Amino acid sequence: MKAFHLLAALAGAAVAQQAQLCDQYATYTGGVYTINNNLWGKDAGSGSQCTTVNSASSAGTSWSTKWNWSGGENSVKSYANSGLTFNKKLVSQISQIPTTARWSYDNTGIRADVAYDLFTAADINHVTWSGDYELMIWLARYGGVQPIGSQIATATVDGQTWELWYGANGSQKTYSFVAPTPITSFQGDVNDFFKYLTQNHGFPASSQYLITLQFGTEPFTGGPATLSVSNWSASVQ
């Protein structure tokens, strides 16, 4: 009987460490990280998506998201992600943004990307789901999907060659660094991307606050497919 109670307690503890997020904007917070199902574009097509949290603490996050979307071939349906809570500061005052991302997709016959998404704004109190500038780092893309705008350069950052794309979404200026082949294990300094933009494309680092830092996947169509993130962590220093 004691063994049964011990097993039951362990099972309960395991369940308590996880969360299943299926509502449109369901979130789970652990430590300095928040995981968001974030089905912001679901009305552009039809389908479903749920995100499972394996762990979230000050040490990092582990989670997965399973989706199946159809319709609206060129429209993003969601951005399930893990985001970092940090003290906002001017980009010019940031010394480094170390990060690690290890992930895998169980189905690559899809239209989707796997990407970092960061927003900056001149107003430190700007809403966190948009900005004056957006920086995306695409670690992978499948099915021929493309960032907003067009390619303007080939850049070398953090020892990796990237396609650099630029486009505008209303007044928001978006720079996207796109890996030519999937990077399923990434460890680097996101601040190096800001430094590149400041030095080569006039990014106003001294007047823009970093307000959002996230990592996740943008599905367009396809599935069922599951993105599994075995580890993601980041800090703003």
From Swiss-Prot:
It catalyses: Endohydrolysis of (1->4)-beta-D-glucosidic linkages in cellulose, lichenin and cereal beta-D-glucans. Keywords: Carbohydrate metabolism, Cellulose degradation, Glycosidase, Hydrolase, Polysaccharide degradation, Pyrrolidone carboxylic acid, Secreted, Signal. One of its GO terms (cellular component) is extracellular region. It is an enzyme of class 3 (hydrolase). Its EC number is 3.2.1.4. GO terms for biological process: cellulose catabolic process. It is found in: Secreted. One of its GO terms (molecular function) is cellulase activity. The keyword NADP does not apply. The modification Pyrrolidone carboxylic acid is found at Q17. Induction: By cellulosic materials and hemicelluloses. Pfam families: Glyco_hydro_12 (PF01670). Residues 1-16 form the signal peptide. InterPro entries: ConA-like_dom_sf, GH11/12, GH12. Will also hydrolyze 1,4-linkages in beta-D-glucans also containing 1,3-linkages. Belongs to the glycosyl hydrolase 12 (cellulase H) family. This is Endoglucanase-1. It comes from Aspergillus aculeatus. The lineage of its organism: Eukaryota, Fungi, Dikarya, Ascomycota, Pezizomycotina.
